[in-house]
Amino acid sequence: MERLNRNRSYQEELNFIEKINDYSYRIKLGFVPNMKVEGLFYADLPLEHLMFEELQHFCSCNGVGGFLPGVKQIGNVAALPGIVGKSIGLPDIHSGYGFAIGNIAAFDVANPKAIVSPGGVGFDINCGVRLIRTNLHERDVNPMKETLAQSLFDHIPVGVGSRGIIPMNARDLDEALEMGMDWSLREGYAWAEDKEHCEEYGRMLQADSNKISLRAKKRGLPQLGTLGAGNHYAEIQAVDEIYDSFAAKSMGINRRGQICIMVHSGSRGLGHQVATDALFNMEKAMIKDGINVNDRQLACARIASDEGQNYLKGMAAAANYAWVNRSSMTFLARQAFAKCFHTTPDDLDMHVIYDVSHNIAKIEEHVVNGKLSTLLVHRKGSTRAFPPHHPLIPVDYQLTGQPVLIGGTMGTCSFVMTGTSQGMSETYGTTCHGAGRALSRAKARRSLNYQEVLDRLNASGISIRVASPKLVMEEAPESYKDVTNVVETCHLAGISKKCFKLRPIAVIKG
């Protein structure tokens, strides 16, 4: 393991960071040891201030405390074997395990030394967002907002340790892990068209349930169809602004005030255990294969090795679990709305607009240095954003580009964007995923009062149902960067395009 150069002053560190334009910065070789490619990150002035403040704090305490700023993590990823292009940080980047959250990197599958790293995916494999539209207007919902919020809260199990109500045994779980949304469709928890509007059509074909440990399966079995805690939520939202009416209409959005439901959840304890198991195995693989990294949290294995392949197959199975999970909650949300409005989900036009992953690694084809290459793209805290006419996006969105779902923080707006050709060439067809933390969870708990946060949401006209009220401080808007700045930076940088904005009217949290 190489040690970071902790003796440089803040001013000396700044010599390695160069502003390219108003929205992007280059990290030069030498910023951390062993960099094989340069780094790149996107930020406007307010976000830039947060990035550099983090670096300045790191320099002032001489790196003591184990905390690494996002820019250093971008540099450490740029030192990994087999990386191509650049190590890229998005505007919502913040410090994470191994990779920063909001850090993307691609590795050349043809290079026998290229690696896969669980830290480049995260512990909540396929944590992601699904957006469901309705034909309801805000005026239809407002008189019964509290009833609807309670109905959603009653239907969807939430919170730490919550247990699902989808009946499942060990055999069902193995089938769900391998079949993804095809299992949901077979069991009657999804509509056929839901799959069409889902990244990977809701199923990663390389999934192998045999690569999931018994402990991971035991954690996952009771949790299917549950929201969980932390930053996971189900929100009833109203369309607040439409920026691109052509693209919005292709998604069934045609007026301000139209009601949507956003579900944000992942692979629960199963995905966490898959990552934990893989990290243990990869630390041994690194010794065996002589792999050196700057940060031991970047534990990795050669893509082609047994350890690398086992992780990718297990990760794919965990991703399938997450898609089944969001499909199960879609089923429950449809039931809740149908019950409240005394009609059917079909009559309410409760169709899935799209479902995206924010934590995943996938083999894709991209142009690097003018040559088409097969790459393993790690997206951690970031969203795939493929452009118009890309073969992997649905027919409905061929003219507009892939919908990109950007969740805000509790009580703030969310956005839908679309993928662009510029994003395809600059960021491997990837953009931001949300607001990105500005305060650590511990600092948020120390500095905020949960009752004040809840009162402020109520004063804003937002109905809220929370399983663990004291966890609310961790997810308060003050704990995060401004999602509007993040989205605007991506839009102005050209890596994705604004389509419409959503405003919360009811929030369900763990």
From Swiss-Prot:
Name this protein carries in UniProt: RNA-splicing ligase RtcB homolog
Enzyme class, broadest EC rank: ligase
Single GO MF annotation: GTP binding
Names of required cofactors: Mn(2+)
Pfam families: RtcB
Residues at the active site: 433
The species this protein was found in: Trichoplax adhaerens (Trichoplax reptans)
Assembly behavior: Catalytic component of the tRNA-splicing ligase complex.
Keyword entries, A-Z: GTP-binding, Ligase, Manganese, Metal-binding, Nucleotide-binding, tRNA processing
EC number(s) from the headed UniProt entry: 6.5.1.8
GO CC terms in record: nucleus; tRNA-splicing ligase complex
Record-linked SUPFAM superfamilies: Hypothetical protein PH1602
Binding-site residues for GMP, renumbered to this chain: 231-235, 358-359, 407-410, 414, 433-436, 509
Domain of life of the native organism: Eukaryota
Reaction it catalyzes: a 3'-end 3'-phospho-ribonucleotide-RNA + a 5'-end dephospho-ribonucleoside-RNA + GTP = a ribonucleotidyl-ribonucleotide-RNA + GMP + diphosphate; a 3'-end 2',3'-cyclophospho-ribonucleotide-RNA + a 5'-end dephospho-ribonucleoside-RNA + GTP + H2O = a ribonucleotidyl-ribonucleotide-RNA + GMP + diphosphate + H(+)
Binding site for Mn(2+) 2: 127, 264, 358
Function as written in the Swiss-Prot or TrEMBL entry: Catalytic subunit of the tRNA-splicing ligase complex that acts by directly joining spliced tRNA halves to mature-sized tRNAs by incorporating the precursor-derived splice junction phosphate into the mature tRNA as a canonical 3',5'-phosphodiester. May act as an RNA ligase with broad substrate specificity, and may function toward other RNAs.
Family the UniProt entry places it in: Belongs to the RtcB family.
Miscellaneous remark of the record: Ligation probably proceeds through 3 nucleotidyl transfer steps, with 2',3'-cyclic phosphate termini being hydrolyzed to 3'-P termini in a step that precedes 3'-P activation with GMP. In the first nucleotidyl transfer step, RTCB reacts with GTP to form a covalent RTCB-histidine-GMP intermediate with release of PPi; in the second step, the GMP moiety is transferred to the RNA 3'-P; in the third step, the 5'-OH from the opposite RNA strand attacks the activated 3'-P to form a 3',5'-phosphodiester bond and release GMP.
Cross-referenced HAMAP family: RtcB_euk
UniProt key word Membrane: no
Cofactor binding description: Binds 2 manganese ions per subunit.
Biological process per Gene Ontology, one example term: tRNA splicing, via endonucleolytic cleavage and ligation
Residues binding Mn(2+) 1, per UniProt: 124, 127, 232
